[in-house]
């Protein structure tokens, strides 16, 4: 698998999702990543630390330049806990849990987050404003309501299927209520 191509595809998809979601500085963005799927394998079966590092480092750079906080979701072996910076956990009052990821429990993305973040910790649950799912890892439990599917510019990174979610405020009030337009809500 060509690492330059994976990095280029990752950059394209993340920048496209950020443009479509119009995220503001200071919000949370969740990443679900199967390096096995990126390489054309089955999720959890052919994990690659190198691919995890390539993708997470690329995404951290893009989000960091915009002041958006990355949360990297682990697999079910760590109950889909997430790696964030300690400062983010404290700022959002997230519950820190005791686990250190491995390649096959947490996954390559979490290992990469531990490598590239300044002071990484694992947290049990977040409510992100948006997220990217590389390889059908199921990020929905960590994206706030109301979730809106986003179609990224590319459908795959490497061989992995790619989807994205954004969120919008709930519409309440009924027939007489009026709602402001937003870029995410469908007509």
Curated annotation (Swiss-Prot):
Alphabetized SUPFAM superfamilies for the sequence: TTHA0583/YokD-like
Pfam families: DUF436
Top-rank taxon, per record: Bacteria
Family: Belongs to the UPF0340 family.
Stated name of the protein: UPF0340 protein SPH_0758
């Amino acid at each position: 698998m060509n690492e330059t191509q994976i990095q280029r595809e990752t950059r394209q998809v993340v920048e496209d999702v950020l443009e479509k979601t119009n995220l503001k500085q200071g919000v949370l963005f969740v990443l679900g990543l199967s390096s096995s799927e990126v390489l054309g394998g089955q999720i959890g079966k052919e994990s690659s630390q190198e691919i995890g590092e390539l993708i997470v480092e690329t995404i951290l750079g893009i989000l960091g330049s915009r002041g958006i906080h990355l949360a990297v979701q682990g697999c079910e072996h760590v109950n889909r806990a997430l790696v964030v910076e300690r400062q983010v956990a404290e700022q959002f009052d997230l519950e820190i849990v005791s686990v250190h990821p491995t390649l096959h429990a947490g996954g390559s993305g979490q290992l990469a987050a531990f490598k590239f973040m300044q002071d990484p910790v694992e947290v049990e649950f977040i409510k992100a404003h948006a997220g990217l799912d590389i390889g059908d890892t199921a990020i929905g439990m960590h994206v706030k309501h109301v979730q809106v599917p986003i179609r990224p510019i590319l459908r795959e990174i490497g061989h992995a299927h790619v989807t994205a979610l954004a969120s919008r405020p709930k519409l309440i009030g009924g027939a007489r209520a009026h709602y402001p337009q937003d870029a995410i809500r469908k007509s």
